[in-house]
Structure formats: structure tokens, C-alpha cells
Amino acid sequence: MAEPSVESSSPGGSATSDDHEFDPSADMLVHDFDDERTLEEEEMMEGETNFSSEIEDLAREGDMPIHELLSLYGYGSTVRLPEEDEEEEEEEEEGEDDEDADNDDNSGCSGENKEENIKDSSGQEDETQSSNDDPSQSVASQDAQEIIRPRRCKYFDTNSEVEEESEEDEDYIPSEDWKKEIMVGSMFQAEIPVGICRYKENEKVYENDDQLLWDPEYLPEDKVIIFLKDASRRTGDEKGVEAIPEGSHIKDNEQALYELVKCNFDTEEALRRLRFNVKAAREELSVWTEEECRNFEQGLKAYGKDFHLIQANKVRTRSVGECVAFYYMWKKSERYDFFAQQTRFGKKKYNLHPGVTDYMDRLLDESESAASSRAPSPPPTASNSSNSQSEKEDGTVSTTNQNGVSSNGPGEILNKEEVKVEGLHINGPTGGNKKPLHADMDTNGYETDNLTTDPKLAHMTARNENDFDEKSERPAKRRRVNSNGKESPGSSEFFQEAVSHGKFEELENTDD
């Protein structure tokens, strides 16, 4: 949309020039007055805008020549016309054919800069003259020159920067640190010391020739499956373990396949030989004796899963392959479960491999070992019981437990609500001179006369009696059975009888 002419002033122009800051008065601030008249005035001014003048300006500008229109908006003679630009571009293209691309870019850019500088100087002179007449036109012309003038030079500069970047991209070689190089070849082979290698360079590892055990490409798979089904079919003469059915799955009978290879893949001849030598075909793993099983388990304890050391030191009657096969059969049996419970064979992976972070198994092992190594508490000695008896005989006013540890002061005395009185429990042997429990003694075995003489404990006994009167209506607790199987009186009943008997004695004394 074309801008309105500078000469014609719009009706809203005067409103913008008269704008000022809104300064509320004291009455507005006191009464919290919100003046919304400014918004209403702006809406009214926007509604009163006359669009007919803008349409007339646009129609008049459409009939103007381009030179007058440019001078009207302040561009003057500095703006280049499209026709002149096309002519200069054609001349530049003809000159570029004779010279190199790099020189043409530099010279073209510098030449254009010179021409633009000349035109800028001439334009500035015209602007100074026109600025005296109309300052608004000069400001508009300067803004337009800043926008339009450097476009062509920036275009060529960006092209040169793109070319430089493309040259740098061609020379740039990215690092290949992210690639994983396969370490295959003579440079990656380990250097074995002289004393470790058992064989010489031209010496064979073993003297026997290789023997073909099975060729899967000679017979199709469906015929091989039919042959294995016929080989595993029972004749009805089997006894013992061999009479147990093996299921409907097809067993990979290596002995039968090897017989088929020896018969030159003749299925009938291979089946005839298998039926003739049934024991050799069915007993893939011979039975291990009890001594061999024990030696194998001892080898697992000593050497772990190093079957070479187990065969060399423990089970010399078997080969390494037989030891490996027996290990997988033995691991599925009940014998392995008993072995794992006794030795924790499958739970100490972190000892063999420190990198394993199985902390749960380690925590269980440590907790079990701590529980097993925990010693029982030592039994009480006779000195503890003798100390308690001597303290009772002396009649000292102190709260002493049955182990002989005393705590002085009324703050250490427990309340009757917290202590469950279940009779006298003394650890250790008791003497024959023990005083019987009667009405003049407290439930802990102390005489009430001695307790009342101490002023620190007098208020404690009175408070306990008041508490007992308030809570005497509670139901009695269940009786407890001691170690001899006899029923001992409950704490509440025992305590109730003792206190009630003591109150009865006090009433008799007051009557006297």
C-alpha cells in the first residue's frame, strides 16, 4: 500500500502531535478514579477517519511519472531505474567474459562502490539543497538511501562468501573418531613370548587327520528329520531308563547322524546299524560313579569352572568334553541344588568377577554371614544377683533392677502405667533368706516404710495411688505363663491386690 503524500495532512495527524502524558489529579487518586475517556476519544477518532482522501491520493499518484513520484517521496535522482540497471548488467557481463571470475568480482564490486560513492556525493548535495526547503523529504530520502543503496554490493559479497565457504568445504576433511576400526591384520596381532608357545611354527597341533562328522548339504532337511524320527522310534524291548518315552520333539541324535555319514548317507543301512548296536547309539553319556561326582564337585569348589584343571587334578578318568557335558546335566539335577545350598556356588559371582554390580546378592550374603557369626548374649553371673540381694537387705532407697545396675534420683523411676509388674524375676540363684511379700512391702520388693521416709519418693507413691483409683475400672489383663508352664498372675490383678490390701491396713490405723 502506498504511503500518503507528505503535502496532504491526514485528520489524525494533529492528534498524534498533541499527545502528552496523562497526569491524574489528587481527586482521582483519592477516589480511585479510572478515566476511560481517552479510550473512547481514540475510538471516535478512528471511526471519523476519512478514507476518501487516501483513495484520491492513490489515484493521483498512479497517474504521476516515475521521476515525479520518486521526488515526491524524497528519493530524488539517486535511485537507479530498472532500465539503467539492466543496461549496466549487460555491459558488465560482456566485460566478465574477457577476464577471470575472481578479478571480475573484485573489480565489479570496487567499480560499483566508486560509482555509488560518486552518486552518493551528488545525492548528498541535492539533499542538502532540498533539506533547506523540506526537512521531512530529506529524512525520508536518507532512510530510503540506506535501505536501497547497498543491495547490489551485498549480493556480490554474499556470493563471494559462499564461494569461499565452498572452497573451504572441499579442503576440509572431517575427523573419523566416531568410526570403529576393525582390528584385523598383522599389525593387531599379539606378540607371544618365546616360552609360552607349546608348538613350533611348522609343527601340527595334533597328528591325526580331520574327520568329517556331518555334512548338511548332502541330504535335504525333510529326509534328515524322517531319519531321526525312525532312529528314535522304540522297538518295545527297552528296559529301565531307556523305556521312558522321550516326547514328540525331534532329538538331535549326533550318533545317528554320524552313522549316516559313515554309511554314505544311506538311511536304511544306517538304521540297520543303529538297531544292531542299540547301546552305543543310546548311551551318549556314560553313567558317572559316586566317587567321580564327588571329585567333580570338589574340583568346582577349588578351581571354579576351569574344566581343564578339574580333569587334570580331580577327574582323570574322564575327558574335558565329558566334564563339560556332565556339568550341564549335573546343574539341572537335585544334586546341584544341595551343592549350591552348602557352598553358595552360584551366588559369589562378584568374587570371581569384580566388575559385576549385583549388590542385592552381596547384601543377602553379608546379612546371612552376619547373622550366623553373631554370638549369643552371655548369661548373667552370680555377682549380679548377690548385689541385688545385698542392696535389698541394706534397705537403701534407690531404684535397682534385677541385674544390679542402679539409677539414683526420682527422674529415673518409671511410672506404674509404664512398668508391667509381673512378680519378682531374679536372674541367678536366690538365697534362702529372702523376705516374703506382704502388705507392708511394695510390688518391687521394697518396704513401704522405707519408701515413705524419703521425701523425694513420698509424692511419687501418692500420685501413683491416685492414678490407680482413676484407672481401677479397666479390665484385667490376660494371665501369662512362666517358663515352668505354670500360670502366673497378671500384672493388673497382682497390683490391685497389693494396693487394696495396703489401703485396708491404712484404714485400720486411722480408726485406732
Curated annotation (Swiss-Prot):
| Coiled-coil region(s) | none
Is Ribonucleoprotein one of the keywords UniProt gives this record? no
**One of the GO BP terms on file:** negative regulation of transcription by RNA polymerase II
Instruction: Write out the biased-composition intervals (Low complexity).
Output: 1-16
Q: Which PROSITE patterns match?
A: ELM2, SANT
Molecular function (GO) terms listed?
A: histone deacetylase binding; transcription corepressor activity
Which region ranges are annotated with the description Interaction with HDAC1?
180-284
The record places domain ELM2 at 180-278
- Gene Ontology CC annotation, any one: transcription repressor complex
- Domain of life the protein comes from: Eukaryota
Q: Where is the composition biased (Polar residues)?
A: 129-144, 396-409, 482-494
Q: Which residues carry this modification: Phosphotyrosine?
A: Y155
- Which SUPFAM superfamilies does this one have? Homeodomain-like
Q: Where does it localize?
A: Nucleus
**What binding partners and quaternary form does the record give?**
Interacts with HDAC1. Part of a complex containing at least CDYL, MIER1, MIER2, HDAC1 and HDAC2.
Q: By its UniProt entry, which PANTHER family does this protein fall under?
A: MESODERM INDUCTION EARLY RESPONSE PROTEIN 1, METASTASIS-ASSOCIATED PROTEIN AND MESODERM INDUCTION EARLY RESPONSE PROTEIN
Protein name (database record): Mesoderm induction early response protein 1
Protein species of origin: Pongo abelii (Sumatran orangutan)
The encoding gene: MIER1
